[in-house]
Amino acid sequence: MRVLLASLLIFGACWAGPVVNTNYGKVEGFEYGAAEVFLAIPFAKPPVDNLRFEKPEAPEPWEDVYQATQFRNDCTPHYRLVAQFSSYSGEDCLTLNVIKPKTIEKKLPVLFWVHGGGYEIGSGSQHGYEFFADRYTSQGVIVVTIQYRLGFMGFFSEGTSDAPGNYGLFDQAAALRFVKENIGNFGGDPDDITIWGYSAGAASVSQLTMSPYTHDLYSKAIIMSASSFVGWATGPNVIDTSKQLAEILGCPWPGAKECMKKKTLHEIFDAVETQGWTTGTIDILRWSPVIDGDYLPKNPENLINDAPIKPTLIGMSNKEGSYFATMNMGRVIADFGLSPEEIPKVDEDFISEIIDRKLLYNNRYGENRQKVWDQILDYYTKQGKPERDLNGFYVDRYAELLSDITFNVPILREITARVERKTPVWTYRFDHYNEQIWKKYIPEQAKGSPHANEYHYLFNMPVMAQIDFKKEPESWLQRDLIDMVVSFAKTGVPHIQDVEWRPVSDPDDVNFLNFQSSGVSVKHGLFQEPLDFWNNLREREGFDLVDPAYSKTTSNSEKDEL
């Protein structure tokens, strides 16, 4: 019997996974190839019951070894249908994942990944751990992926000190602080953490670089396809949306928070379906951060002046808006998609109607509304107008209109602001696309690299198509994008092949690395024309459609919102 017991103990010990100490207790992970993986480590108390709609609190210490061997709850999205697609979804979700090399001879740089999804959907589990282990940690970095509260759970706000909102941002800060304090035990360098995000994750990273809560918690930043300067990253309608949701649920306003804490997820999801899950306007998101005087003490265009000077990598695709417009994707967070039947009908009148209904709603620009309408319509439908293939031209210009307002211009504004403060900023644009991602009915003129296209290459995720990375140019493009990220995390300077890629030197003529099917090269003048158009319009009119929260003057109705 003793021999059997001893054998079982030896067998169990042989199969035990790697164990690491944290400030809150031990965690046990598992091995995957040449990596060690630790999943769903709690970095905060579960934000449930009395902690719903509150800032995150440090986790309770645990005595037993925590089994960090499987993904657990994804954070609750803003819409029931999305939750139903998740294998795990719930409020107890504030966890992070660590993927590290088995063998570590010195402290390694850390990549801290913040997922996107419009602050309303997404998870730390959606990227898995296998590809990170195979292509990132194998190059001598540690990868951390996190989760944060989303939608109404993460961003419900009354605009008061008692219910300010931004709980999802405070979750990100709590996760980053946990990593800062504990990553050394995993073999990581707490003084060499690169924060990295895409889309709303990129806007979050931009906000992390500026918030007084996180100034000292990172060393470098990678901001892909978004910015804290975009209007939807500090939504002008969040408080109104919160009030409407509370009223549907029968909660008093102001002072709805305690009542909202008692509502079940089922009740809140029912109310969201009554309310609608998208705005239907250029402001896009119902739920997003707000300028709360705390995490974001002021608008990012002002807050960036207080941000520390640290190396930053910023990039985008050349047709960001086509993901939402011509591809008709992201429908659970944005309502701008064109159906196959609508695409052949897109013309100047269609774009004019979009400007009227979705951009200039609520009497934006006041008495100058018609003049601004005409200027926007002229810029996007008259300039460069061809004699033939007008439908392809208009479909492309519709997508460009969305691209410029929601991605290109605000990203360029952030690049400009950082460069003017002497921050070393490297910039890229990804133009390549695989034909498989585009439907046959899309006009050729409207094709390009859409938002989320890099997900195929950075994470091997078939967001739009299953791409064969054994073929060229897909293979070298994937290698170069990953090398760009890893080299920047390791050295603070991105390296691509033998290309001499320098930081941006002239904010009025931005130099950038251009990824094309034929190769990579350095170019100048990144989206300069639309940047000039929207900057001049803001200066003339005193209102900024790109970022309403920054506007100097507004119509009376807009003032009420802000």
Curated annotation (Swiss-Prot):
Q: Has keyword Nucleotide-binding?
A: no
Specify the signal sequence span: 1-16
User: What Gene Ontology terms for biological process does this UniProt record contain?
Assistant: cellular catabolic process
> What does UniProt give as GO cellular component?
endoplasmic reticulum lumen; peroxisome
Free-text tissue specificity from the UniProt record: Expressed only in the intestine.
Motif (Prevents secretion from ER) spans which residues? Answer: 559-562
Q: What is its main location?
A: endoplasmic reticulum
Catalytic function, reaction form: a carboxylic ester + H2O = an alcohol + a carboxylate + H(+)
Enzyme category, top tier: hydrolase
Which Cys-Cys disulfides exist here? Answer: 75-93, 251-259
- A single Gene Ontology molecular function, please? carboxylesterase activity
**Would the keyword Disulfide bond turn up in this protein's UniProt record?**
yes
Q: Where in the cell is it found?
A: Endoplasmic reticulum lumen
Q: Which family does it belong to?
A: Belongs to the type-B carboxylesterase/lipase family.
The entry's protein name is: Gut esterase 1
Q: Which organism is it from?
A: Caenorhabditis briggsae
